[in-house]
């Protein structure tokens, strides 16, 4: 009985946290100056895309390791090569997710994200849609960047009961990722730590 009560409590608590945390984003998201103009641009672009391109826009591969013909074995993918650049150009992916293997140093990461975007926007098919460059930089034990500010994880932030601490942590992570050319962070998450 106690186990079911605890599960219900945790589910209710997580639902409440997610609802309350979404309220804080209302003030951050500004309305577009002209929503009709944005819709028109998107509709125009979509009308020119093939079905294959539309499907590819929903795909987000990772390139953690790569082995070119001249390599003796797989290596962490940290520097753009001709093979990956051609894949990005040919397939019109919607994004690429980066992991620790990709983001060792600040300068290296910025160069890689710049090269990925250049490959995505230099195609000859006319779509030239920039990539969503993503990562799951949550803080705590889920820390992908090889350099940057080490911040506490969600459990530690929650223990402080400080919305200011959580906000500051999110802002630091957001600024650092943006400076590296990463435009989506799959965080924070509503993980339940089942093995503390």
Regions found by a protein language model. Name each.
Residues 11-22:
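Hydrophobic alpha-helical targeting segments used for export or membrane insertion
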Residues 38-68, 89:
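Mature N-terminal segment immediately following signal peptide/propeptide cleavage
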């Amino acid at each position: 009985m106690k186990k079911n009560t605890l599960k219900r409590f945790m589910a209710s608590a997580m639902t409440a946290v997610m609802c309350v945390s979404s309220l804080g984003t209302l003030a951050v998201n500004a309305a577009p100056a002209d929503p009709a103009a944005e819709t028109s641009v998107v509709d125009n672009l979509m009308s020119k895309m093939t079905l294959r391109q539309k499907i590819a826009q929903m795909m987000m591969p990772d390139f953690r390791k790569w082995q070119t013909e001249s390599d003796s074995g797989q290596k962490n993918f940290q520097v753009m090569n001709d093979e990956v650049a051609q894949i990005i150009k040919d397939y019109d992916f919607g994004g690429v997710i980066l992991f620790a293997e990709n983001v060792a140093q600040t300068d290296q990461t910025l160069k890689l994200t710049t090269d990925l975007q250049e490959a995505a926007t230099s195609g000859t098919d006319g779509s030239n849609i920039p990539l969503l460059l993503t990562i799951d930089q949550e803080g705590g034990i889920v820390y992908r960047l090889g350099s940057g500010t080490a911040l506490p994880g969600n459990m530690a932030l929650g223990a402080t009961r400080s919305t200011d601490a959580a906000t500051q942590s999110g802002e630091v992570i957001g600024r650092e990722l943006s400076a590296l050319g990463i435009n989506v962070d799959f965080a924070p998450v509503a993980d339940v730590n089942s093995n503390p």
